[in-house]
């Protein structure tokens, strides 16, 4: 299984072995749940290494998005003739007023009432985290799409949690880093060689993937593949005394070298019956760096990396741009449960919806059925965790109306000009998001989940269109995402709703 330096391995868990006591400095065996294996190393830590700098770019560029040409009797235009000029025509006050009249109405008193926090559930949430943080790490996991992946919202949430319950570290370090829209709470992440990413299918009947807690897998098949992470955080208070790497044991699994703070701890063999494998590094002093080097031409599949301190609170951010709620139905459930058995959560936050309501075939009843299955899957793995649902926020769509006109320059000359007017649909997606939020609220009660309706919060502030017109704007140019300032403002409102802004727990 493992080629090791002497006295490094403290504990090894395997599904077919009988219980035994762990002895410091010696390999020992104990029982664990089905489909898991666990190994622990003890290291000194405390090395002050130079800041990690990647030799190759780590971020992939987002594909350029262009507005969809508008359709209609007088809107669909042929391309402008060669030599023509485009003129941007702003909406007149009358046109804007007429457009705003067609917008989704501000939230009703009933909607505002529905979005009030349930005091008993809030108290239970805090009691759970308070009790956990006094004895160990209190863990909160948040799953969602690009709103969470960007780390602006989650950074505010994480800091509020840790101001209340203690700084427990950075938490999940998403190994998919490099994907557009995904940021990390650590200093640097370098990936070399060929790595293949796998995310769950969105369609229900597609084959399920083998994943860990993050609902993703990342596989290398080449000895030139490597990862190196600077564990020192962008937040000065975060310290990594404990690091856990989750990987997939599989019949054709390969090997990789594990290097911590520049010292090679050994070669890990991932071959075996399909299971969740965990390698945990515990240090007396904070760790600076971890490196993994694939050492042969066989598959090595990684499922997640986690960095934390000894006590306090941790927020594991599993946000991935483009993720949909149906991802929960696209992973092997027993393997996911095995991952949860290795890293359990006191509270779960699901922030889905924006990517679930797109397309031309929006059907609220089908969404209700799908979202119920998401909650069933979550509760099957984490039946006792406190639960919060964050609904999709407000969103509008932009389209352009083009008109080619002839403009007289002088008595003898005219030129073609393309006049472009920007219009906004303030009803279609705000209405869908409001419907999705209402469905989440109904199902939340059934599955013991509090619901924070971000669409109501944004509509109460005037909606996405009004947030775009702020100076500085709180809505990004695509009118789907928010700006960093907008995400921070939403997070502050969420933190207030959750009664996290009242300071350190007694």
Ranges and model annotations:
Residues 1-48:
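Sec-dependent N-terminal signal peptides
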Residues 5-8, 24-27, 116-166, 357-358:
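Conserved, well-structured beta-alpha core segment at the onset of a catalytic domain
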Residues 48-142, 197-200, 205, 211-226:
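Membrane/wall-proximal cationic-aromatic binding patches
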Residues 116-119, 134, 138, 147-156, ...:
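Soluble non-cytosolic domains of exported or imported proteins
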Residues 316, 388, 450-452:
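Hydrophobic/aromatic beta-strand patches that form the interior of the parallel beta-sheet core
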Residues 333, 395-506:
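Catalytic His-Asp segment of secreted/periplasmic serine-dependent ester chemistry enzymes
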């Amino acid at each position: 299984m493992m080629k090791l330096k002497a006295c490094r391995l403290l504990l090894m868990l395997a599904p077919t072995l009988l219980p035994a006591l762990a002895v410091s400095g010696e390999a020992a065996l104990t029982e664990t749940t089905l489909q898991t294996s666990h190994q622990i190393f003890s290291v000194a830590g405390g090395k002050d290494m130079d800041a990690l700098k990647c030799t190759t770019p780590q971020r992939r560029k987002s594909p350029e998005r262009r507005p969809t040409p508008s359709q209609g009797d007088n809107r669909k235009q042929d391309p402008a003739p060669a030599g023509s000029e485009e003129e941007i025509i702003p909406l007149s006050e009358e046109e804007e007023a007429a457009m705003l009249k067609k917008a989704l109405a501000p939230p009703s008193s009933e909607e505002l009432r529905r979005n009030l926090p349930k005091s008993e559930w809030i108290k239970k949430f805090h009691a759970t985290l308070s009790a956990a943080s006094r004895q160990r790490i209190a863990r909160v996991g948040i799953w969602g799409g690009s709103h969470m992946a960007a780390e602006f919202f989650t950074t505010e949430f994480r800091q509020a949690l840790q101001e209340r319950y203690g700084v427990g570290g950075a938490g999940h370090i998403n190994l998919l880093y490099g994907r557009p829209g995904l940021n990390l709470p650590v200093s640097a992440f370098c990936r070399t060689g060929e790595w293949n990413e796998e995310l769950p299918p969105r369609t229900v009947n597609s084959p399920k993937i083998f994943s860990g807690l993050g609902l993703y897998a990342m596989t290398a098949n080449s000895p030139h593949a490597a990862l190196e992470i600077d564990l020192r955080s962008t937040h000065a208070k975060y310290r990594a005394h404990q690091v856990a790497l989750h990987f997939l044991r599989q019949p054709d699994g390969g090997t990789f070298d594990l290097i911590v703070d520049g010292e090679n701890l050994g070669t890990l063999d991932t071959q075996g019956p399909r299971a969740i494998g965990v390698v945990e590094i515990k240090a007396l002093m904070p760790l600076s760096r971890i490196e993994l080097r694939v050492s042969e031409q066989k598959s090595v599949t990684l499922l997640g990396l986690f960095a934390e301190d000894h006590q306090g609170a941790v927020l594991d951010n599993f946000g991935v741009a483009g993720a949909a709620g149906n991802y929960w139905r696209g992973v092997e459930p027993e393997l996911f449960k095995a991952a949860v058995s290795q890293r359990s959560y006191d509270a779960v936050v699901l922030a889905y919806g924006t990517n679930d309501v797109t397309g031309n075939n929006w059907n609220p009843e089908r969404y209700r059925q799908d979202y119920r299955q998401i909650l069933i899957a979550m509760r099957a793995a984490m039946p006792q965790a406190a639960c919060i649902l964050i609904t999709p926020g407000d969103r509008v769509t932009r389209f352009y109306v083009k008109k080619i006109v002839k403009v007289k320059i002088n008595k003898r000359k005219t030129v073609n000009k393309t006049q472009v007017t920007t219009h906004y649909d303030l009803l279609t997606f705000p209405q869908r998001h409001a419907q999705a939020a209402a469905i989440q609220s109904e199902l939340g009660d059934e599955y013991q989940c509090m619901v924070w309706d971000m669409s109501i919060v944004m509509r109460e502030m005037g909606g996405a269109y009004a947030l775009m017109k702020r100076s500085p704007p709180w809505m990004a140019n695509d009118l789907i995402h928010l700006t960093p300032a907008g995400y921070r403002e939403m997070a502050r409102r969420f933190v207030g709703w959750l009664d996290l802004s009242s300071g350190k727990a007694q």
